[in-house]
Curated annotation (Swiss-Prot):
Organism (species): Cervus elaphus (Red deer)
UniProt: Zn(2+) binding residues: 211-212
Basic and acidic residues bias spans: 329-349
Gene Ontology biological process terms, A to Z: positive regulation of cell population proliferation
Record's function text: This is a receptor for the anterior pituitary hormone prolactin.
Protein name stated in the entry: Prolactin receptor
Subunit structure: Interacts with SMARCA1. Interacts with NEK3 and VAV2 and this interaction is prolactin-dependent.
Extracellular membrane side: 25-234
Residue pairs linked by disulfide bridges in the UniProt entry: 36-46, 75-86
InterPro entries documented for this protein: FN3_dom, FN3_sf, Growth/epo_recpt_lig-bind, Ig-like_fold, Long_hematopoietin_rcpt_CS, Type-I_Cytokine_Rcpt
Source species, domain of life: Eukaryota
Length: 581
């Protein structure tokens, strides 16, 4: 019995179900939330799309709860936003809160719910379109005409309080065109449009968007008619200029790519580094010092010297028995077997300083108008007063420096010569004096050999008027001497060979080895010393008086009687004597 009752109940239920299906009734379909939008972060509205009702009346409800809460709330206002909407007023709107929103559909056949939607009011802001869009053509005098577009912010958006910032976007097009021309206006509420086509009617719209949110809907269209006389910028010229500039740039890039280094060198030449004139770096790298020095010497640099003034520290005058005041024997005397003896000067005597070509250059440049000539007196007793033994005759004024020949007294005090530089431009040859030994050799001749030869030579065979010939000018000098010495015809006018009364050479050699003293007047005193003493000691004489400097640059010293009377114990001068006058 029990099994029959159960089967009957199931059968009845199936009959009822089949009857409802045959009538088209079913549970409601699943609804869908479209979006939620807030016009100004103070209120917001949500829209949904309902599903099928199942042939039965269906009731839709919106429920929500805030994140972190368990209490579920129903929509506070279903009417303000319109059908299938829910409006949240300021009382029910909270910022920085996330809402979990769900839409439920209920009928007699069942219940269905939509997928939940998570909403943050800050990021669902979609303002209303801007209001009061205005279009106006402007014709300024100093500028080109333009279309001036002006609008106002949305009415429901609190822009003045700074609650949020709104950006604007404008689009316009000719009425017959299909595409819109969009201009971004940022935060400003006006915009100027140039380059409009004349005779066209333009349509303009504007919209806005907050800093966080969505673009608003476009505002209603506004239109304006552009007159036919509206000036338009001719862009053809600018297009031509742009194309030409692009071609020039391409050519320059191509040239730089091919010849970049040469062009850069031409435009920006390299700055030369510091370089010493005549200094070759390649020669220095090769290590060829000879070529480097030769390159440096070839430059036109003036020679430099550490010493501006050449000073003479030592003066040494030799008066030796082997050297007498007579000219160097010529080739004719050499054929007779007479050879001159050369006396090597002491390398430590400081005599090399006398060879300076710049020494006494001023003296050499001054013309000697009255050359002196010295003669040998016949009376040997006149040796006591050497100053009286010197006879000076003036040569004619027309006589040049080359014609002036010095003559020396044979029995007078032994003299020394001073070497002067001879100018190389002289045509007539002269002897070149480079040291005291050569002067003495030229002046005195040969020492011992000459004395022996003179003893064997007939004294009367030599002429008293024979003089020393220099540079082939002996005859002219003889004639001038004979004319100038007319005041003293009794004395010999030349250099005679040794006579009986006056021996030519001293028996004992004299050698000047030191400077005796220098007087307060700057007079140089030389002290003669004998190497050997035979018999009674001879009285030494001091040759301290400079008689003169001859044209041949020979310094002549004679005894000074006043200097001889001074004491020999006077301390010699420590400094070099001043230049001789």
């Amino acid at each position: 019995m029990k099994e029959n009752v159960a089967s009957r109940a199931v059968f009845i239920l199936l009959l009822f179900l089949n009857a409802s299906l045959l009538n088209g009734q079913s549970p409601p379909g699943k609804p869908k939330i479209i979006k939620c939008r807030s016009p100004g972060k103070e209120t917001f509205t949500c829209w949904w799309e309902p599903g099928s009702d199942g042939g039965l009346p269906t009731n839709y409800t919106l429920t929500y709860h805030k994140e972190g809460e368990t209490l579920i709330h129903e929509c506070p206002d279903y009417k303000t936003g319109g059908p299938n909407t829910c409006y949240f007023s300021k009382k029910h709107t909270s910022i920085w809160k996330i809402y979990v929103i769900t839409v439920n559909a209920i009928n007699q056949m069942g219940v269905s719910s939509s997928d939940p939607l998570y909403v943050d009011v800050t990021y669902i802001v979609e303002p209303e379109p801007p209001a009061n869009l205005t279009l106006e053509l402007k014709h300024p005098e100093d500028r080109k005409p333009y279309l001036w577009i002006k609008w106002f912010p949305p009415t429901l958006t609190d822009v003045k309080s700074g609650w949020f910032m709104i950006q604007y976007e404008i689009r316009l097009k000719p009425e017959t065109a299909a595409d819109w021309e969009i201009h971004f206006a940022a935060k400003q509420t006006q915009l100027k449009i140039f380059s409009l086509y004349p005779g066209q009617k333009y349509l303009v719209q504007v919209r806005c968007k907050p800093d966080h949110g969505y673009w608003s809907e476009w505002s209603p269209e506004s239109s304006i008619q552009i007159p036919n006389d509206f000036p338009v910028n001719d862009t053809t010229v600018w297009i031509f200029v742009a194309v030409l500039s692009a071609v020039i740039c391409l050519i320059m890039v191509w040239a730089v790519a091919l010849k970049g280094y040469s062009m850069m060198t031409c435009i920006l030449p390299p700055v030369p580094g510091p370089k010493i004139k005549g200094f070759d770096i390649h020669l220095l790298e090769k290590g060829k010092s000879e070529e480097l020095l030769r390159a440096l010497e070839s430059q036109d640099f003036p020679p430099t010297s550490d010493c501006e003034d050449l000073l003479m520290e030592f003066i040494e005058v030799d008066d030796s028995e082997d050297q007498q005041l007579m000219p160097r024997p010529s080739k004719e005397h050499m054929e007779q077997g007479v050879k001159p003896m050369h006396m090597d000067p002491d390398s430590d005597s400081g005599r090399g300083s006398c060879d300076s070509p710049s020494l006494f250059s001023e003296k050499c440049d001054e013309p000697q108008a009255h050359p002196f000539k010295f003669y040998t007196p016949e009376d040997p007793e006149k040796l006591e007063n050497p100053e009286t033994n010197l006879t000076c005759l003036q040569a004619p004024q027309s006589t040049s420096r080359e014609d002036k020949i010095p003559y020396f007294h044979a029995n007078g005090p032994k003299s020394s010569t001073w070497p002067f530089p001879q100018p190389p431009s002289l045509h007539n040859p002269r002897y070149s004096y480079h040291n005291i030994a050569d002067v003495c050799e030229l002046a005195l001749g040969m020492a011992g050999t000459t004395a022996t030869l003179l003893d064997q030579t007939d004294q009367h065979a030599l002429k008293p008027s024979k003089t020393i010939e220099t540079g082939g000018e002996g005859k002219a000098a003889k004639q001038r001497e004979s004319e100038g010495c007319s005041s003293k015809p009794d004395q010999d006018t030349g250099w005679p060979l040794p006579q009986d009364k006056t021996p030519l050479i001293s028996a004992k050699p004299l050698e000047y080895v030191e400077i005796h003293k220098v007087s307060q007047d700057g007079v140089l005193a030389l002290f003669p010393k004998q190497n050997e003493k035979v018999g009674a000691p001879e009285t030494s004489k001091e040759y301290s008086k400079v008689s003169r400097v001859t044209d041949s640059n020979i310094l002549v010293l004679v005894p000074d009687t006043q200097v001889q009377n001074l004491t020999l114990l006077e301390e010699p001068a420590k400094e070099a004597p001043p230049a001789l006058p």
